[in-house]
């Protein structure tokens, strides 16, 4: 019953959007209108976002949704008899009959009181069984259902089920459309926590939506070549006490546990909410790298384990001063402890010059990230007219200690050892002012200001003779304006963002002269969007935006990130920003069995930032893995995704994408000479997530993914694929769900590469891809919906380095 109501509500919302566009196309043709106000029968409070559907002889005509004050106004109706349905999740549907005539053009239904449906569970949060995908003018929204929640315990695990998104299972580095230059936000806010770590701390059961914004408007921070991934967490605003509990365990080589708890209480003018997530487990990784560098041929076998424990908590309050003024505050607190231990075994093949090495290591790191957010929103008399002030402060303290010992592999004699004590402290302050004014019913103006101040201090201490410090400060001041216009079947939005960017970096070493870097850039970032809706079953969206990827602290920090006997990983302080011009065209078609969206995109990239490996100029026996700017490059591709209901018992989310890129740059060869190199690469990816409904409460999932080969200037990544099966069963009259999943049933998922620059090499990395997950989710509560809307914006820190390739 709940699922049917949810589908009705969702379809009603979609119909209302289309109907409103259709209405605006005929302003002068149909003079009739229907208005009214919807309230809760028990509390007499107005109900926002209620579906109002107008039918003629049981045939859909038009519709709309109520405002924050519960008011609806539907116009441009012919002189006819209609039935008006008032539909809302958890409430009984009410139908009113009206007749619009020349003598009675404007029908006022006055106040309509609706009551909760006694058949429904009292206040239990409704989670759709199946995830859905919505294509908006500037973003793709994935509404997370139980099928995705059961796909994994954390955000990182379910991201691989999302169209166009890939997560490296070894490093947890995230990419969008094959590019790792992507911003990751949580509730539209940034975090100083590295995205690869953040994805492992967010419980999947706490996620409401995932937004893919591949061509953000001028309102958004322009950083991120491939766009923005915004993770929207559940936040109830139901009257009374509501919440959910989620627990799970994953069995790989070792068990891993996760727990999540969400709680909300609203009474009167206050809404209190909070959630807590806990993850603990040991992860096993192993692999090899074979190098055929002349006179240094070697085989590295490595094995390392991570024992990670994380706590992530969010607590907040909304204070509704009155209908037009709302103050909100929340804080995020994240605690993470990671212990690493393992070894690298280096066997120099047919080489008597170099000694075979064994390097055991262990590391211990503790980090604490804290975010404080304040928001004040004023709503003016005119619907949609608002002013919003927001301040956000984030601080991340991340110390780490690592001990490396180099041994003669045969005799086990100690050659040398060293300790790395690294401390990183990052602070980020952001202040925004946003103004929205609907100038007319079809025209909207948005203006805004933003100030960002980011400071990072990174220190390395090995001994009194070898220590270094790196300070990185960024100040960014922005102003933006967008203007949107709708007419008939068309809608258009254009805008621009002006940014003043200033960066200062200082690198100090005990044994060398200080290194300084400064940059000051004034840039403008335009964006345009054009949408055409010829009918309720078809829509076209065309967009353009200019974006920038400024080097992150992980990409410019010259202090070594990690080390093996043959490779050091470090940043490049001489990196310059890369700029991208992005074009995109999408078409959405609604059919009897669901909706299908297809699109094409093109990106022109200037000074592309990418991974590079070269010989260490200070030690020819070692390589340096770092970053560099390559030449101007091009990438274009196609995407197809669909939400399809083949049968009443079988539905599927399907996505296919293919892209081609031309990469150019100057790369070191085996002779030590740097030469210009160019590569044309084509990659194909596919995903399908099937849901099979066996009974009312029992469902099965079958997920499969294929990630095609990818070529780069130095390395080619091999094909990757896997298949998962899972099931979920509703108990306790629908308030509880038991889920199970068997991941990578054929144990095929691993990372493998082949390289030929600067020398021939190949390797493979393995992790606990094959695993079994068992989980239980319980939802409770007593309230009804009354949501508060807060803006979602892009303000994320650029993703850092991490990972080998």
Give the role of each language-model region.
Residues 21-26, 39, 51-55, 87-91, ...:
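Short, acidic, small-residue-rich periplasmic hinge/interaction motif at the N-terminus
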Residues 108-113, 155-158, 174, 197-198, ...:
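N-terminal periplasmic accessory domains that precede
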Residues 75, 189-214:
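Short acidic/polar hinge/loop motifs at secondary-structure boundaries
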Residues 222-229, 237-287, 308-311:
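Outer-membrane beta-barrel translocator/receptor signature
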Residues 4, 312-336, 361-508, 533, ...:
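Face-selective signature of the C-terminal outer-membrane beta-barrel domain
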Residues 57-71:
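Short, acidic Ser/Thr/Gly-rich low-complexity loop/linker segments typical of extracellular
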Residues 301, 419, 428-432, 466-470, ...:
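Outer membrane beta-barrel strand-and-loop segments of large Gram-negative receptors
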Residues 397, 502-505, 532, 536-582, ...:
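Surface-exposed extracellular loop regions of Gram-negative outer-membrane beta-barrel proteins
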């Amino acid at each position: 019953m709940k699922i049917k109501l949810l589908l009705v509500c969702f379809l009603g919302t979609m119909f209302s959007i289309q109907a409103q566009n259709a209405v605006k196309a005929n302003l002068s043709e149909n003079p009739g209108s229907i208005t009214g106000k919807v309230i809760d029968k028990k509390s007499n409070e107005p109900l926002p976002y209620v579906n109002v559907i107008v039918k003629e002889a049981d045939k859909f005509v038009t519709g709309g949704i109520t405002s924050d004050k519960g008011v609806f106004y539907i116009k441009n109706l012919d002189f006819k008899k209609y039935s008006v349905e008032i539909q809302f999740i958890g409430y009984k549907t009410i139908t009113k009959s009206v007749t619009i005539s020349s003598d009675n053009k404007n029908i006022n239904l006055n106040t309509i009181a609706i009551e909760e449906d006694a058949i429904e569970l009292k206040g239990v949060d409704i989670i759709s069984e199946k995830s859905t995908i919505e294509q908006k003018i500037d973003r793709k929204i994935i509404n997370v259902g139980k099928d995705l929640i059961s796909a994994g315990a954390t955000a990182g695990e379910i991201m691989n089920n999302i169209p166009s998104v890939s997560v490296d299972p070894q490093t947890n580095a995230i990419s969008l459309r094959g590019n790792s230059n992507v911003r990751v936000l949580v509730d539209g806010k940034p975090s100083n926590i590295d995205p690869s770590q953040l994805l492992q701390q967010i419980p999947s059961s706490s996620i409401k939506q995932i937004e893919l914004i591949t061509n953000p408007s001028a309102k958004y921070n322009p950083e991120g070549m491939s766009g923005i991934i915004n993770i929207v967490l559940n936040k109830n605003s139901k009257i009374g006490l509501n919440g959910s509990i989620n627990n799970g365990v994953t069995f790989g080589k070792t068990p891993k546990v996760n727990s999540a708890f969400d709680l909300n209480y609203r009474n009167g003018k206050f809404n209190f909410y909070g959630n807590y997530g806990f993850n603990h487990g040991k992860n096993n990784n192993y692999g090899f790298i074979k190098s055929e560098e002349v006179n240094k041929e070697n085989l590295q076998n490595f094995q390392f384990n991570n024992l990670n424990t994380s706590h992530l908590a969010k607590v907040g309050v909304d204070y509704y001063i009155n209908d037009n003024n709302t103050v909100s505050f929340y804080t995020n607190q994240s605690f993470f402890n990671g212990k690493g231990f393992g070894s690298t075994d280096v066997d120099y093949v047919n080489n008597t010059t170099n000694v075979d090495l064994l390097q055991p290591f262990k590391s211990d790191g503790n980090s604490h990230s804290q975010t404080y957010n304040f928001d004040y929103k004023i709503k003016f008399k005119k619907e949609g007219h608002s002013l919003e002030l927001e301040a956000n402060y984030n601080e991340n303290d991340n110390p780490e200690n690592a001990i490396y010992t180099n041994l003669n592999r045969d005799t086990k004699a100690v050659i040398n050892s060293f300790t790395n004590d690294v401390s990183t402290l990052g602070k980020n302050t952001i202040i925004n002012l946003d103004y929205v004014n609907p100038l007319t019913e079809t025209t909207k103006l948005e203006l805004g200001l933003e100030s960002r101040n980011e400071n990072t201090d990174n220190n390395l201490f090995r001994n009194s003779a070898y220590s270094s410090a790196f300070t990185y400060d960024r100040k960014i001041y922005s102003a933006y304006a967008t203007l949107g216009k709708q007419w008939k079947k068309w809608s258009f939005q254009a805008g621009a963002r002006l940014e003043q960017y200033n960066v200062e970096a200082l690198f100090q070493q005990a044994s060398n002269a200080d290194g300084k870097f400064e940059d000051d850039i004034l840039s403008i970032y335009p964006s345009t969007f054009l949408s055409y809706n010829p009918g309720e079953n078809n829509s076209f969206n065309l967009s353009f935006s200019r974006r920038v990827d400024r080097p992150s602290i992980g990409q410019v920090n010259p202090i070594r990130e990690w080390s093996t006997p043959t490779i050091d990983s470090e940043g490049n302080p001489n990196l310059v920003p890369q700029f991208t011009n992005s074009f995109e065209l999408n078409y959405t078609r609604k059919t009897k069995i669901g909706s299908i969206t297809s699109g094409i995109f093109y990106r022109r990239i200037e000074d592309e930032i990418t991974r590079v490996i070269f010989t260490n100029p200070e030690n020819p026996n070692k390589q340096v893995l770092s970053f560099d700017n390559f030449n101007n490059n091009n990438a274009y591709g196609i995407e197809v995704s669909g939400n399809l209901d083949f049968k009443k018992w079988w539905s599927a989310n399907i996505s296919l994408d293919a892209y081609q890129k031309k990469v150019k740059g100057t790369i070191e060869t085996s002779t030590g000479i740097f030469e210009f190199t160019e590569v044309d690469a084509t990659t194909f990816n596919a995903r399908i997530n099937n849901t099979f409904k066996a009974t009312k409460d029992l469902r099965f999932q079958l997920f499969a993914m294929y990630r095609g080969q990818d070529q780069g200037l130095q390395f080619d990544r091999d094909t990757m694929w896997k298949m998962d099966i899972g099931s979920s069963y509703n108990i306790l009259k629908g308030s509880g769900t038991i889920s199970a999943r068997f991941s990578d049933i054929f144990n095929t998922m691993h990372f493998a590469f082949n390289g030929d620059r600067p020398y021939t090499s190949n390797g493979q990395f393995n992790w606990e891809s094959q695993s079994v997950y068992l989980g239980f989710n319980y939802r409770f509560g007593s309230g009804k919906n009354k949501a508060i809307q807060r803006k979602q914006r892009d303000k994320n820190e650029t993703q850092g380095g991490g990972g080998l390739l």
